[in-house]
UniProtKB/Swiss-Prot annotation:
Natural source organism: Homo sapiens (Human)
GO terms for cellular component: Golgi membrane; membrane
Top-level taxonomic group: Eukaryota
Location in the cell: Golgi apparatus membrane
Protein name: Alpha-N-acetylneuraminide alpha-2,8-sialyltransferase
Gene3D superfamilies: Glycosyl transferase family 29 (3.90.1480.20)
Annotated pathway: Protein modification; protein glycosylation; Lipid metabolism; sphingolipid metabolism
Disulfide feature: 138-287, 152-347
Gene this chain is encoded by: ST8SIA1
Amino acid sequence: MSPCGRARRQTSRGAMAVLAWKFPRTRLPMGASALCVVVLCWLYIFPVYRLPNEKEIVQGVLQQGTAWRRNQTAARAFRKQMEDCCDPAHLFAMTKMNSPMGKSMWYDGEFLYSFTIDNSTYSLFPQATPFQLPLKKCAVVGNGGILKKSGCGRQIDEANFVMRCNLPPLSSEYTKDVGSKSQLVTANPSIIRQRFQNLLWSRKTFVDNMKIYNHSYIYMPAFSMKTGTEPSLRVYYTLSDVGANQTVLFANPNFLRSIGKFWKSRGIHAKRLSTGLFLVSAALGLCEEVAIYGFWPFSVNMHEQPISHHYYDNVLPFSGFHAMPEEFLQLWYLHKIGALRMQLDPCEDTSLQPTS
């Protein structure tokens, strides 16, 4: 038995001893006995773990420093893990090869709903994953406020393949910090509902907004939740009808589910992983080199100065939906072992930039 197993058994026995000591001659009701068993089993399976708070994490990063050296062995080992668990090369997107006509699939974010691939959806899929694999040098760009005044735009645009999250603004006021290049951009159905009224009245506005992404793939989780399917299909038809440069790819729910299980087995307990972690996971399986930017979910920067939540606004997410500190710690670990590079310091000297 492992030391962890022995410790858990000792914890359970200790709890039983406390109950016996406090109630030496008291017989617990049947319901209370069952509840005690459930609690003790829970403690055995999920021992108590306290996640470091924001200040502790920031201090830990400062103490360890951001110095980095690429570890080809670690990168290959993690890529192999991604291939074994999730097969991003074949399952990253819905294709005619992995989603044939008549196949039944489950929504990855709902347990009660499934769907069947019919002619109306099958015709929207590419024959296979449309990338020349492996991708060489990838940049995954989050939207964290740490990017503001970072001067990382040029470095980001030097990557061969740039992935971005949730249709971020790329206007000229931001390009010095976040770049302008993109090959793949995610778009959650919730964004289509909130910003573009489900494309019921604002198709032109949507098409105009998409032009900044040039020839990017628009990656959408159309089959994660049943409510997301219709908005995602509208995006596909809208861009197709106007002959837009962008191409819609639908995330394969089996891939998303596998990624979720992979990270849950490594200690991330959340209702759902963030879009950023999904993208980084895919990049680690598809790319030879991965650098990530804007993945800093804290309210202060590396100099412990206050920063906005996003580089373009300070709108906070709903609490409890994602486990951002846990995700950060996992990515920070991959940075420290050299499997990916996490950019936290400014890329260029921005001290002479005028303040806004």
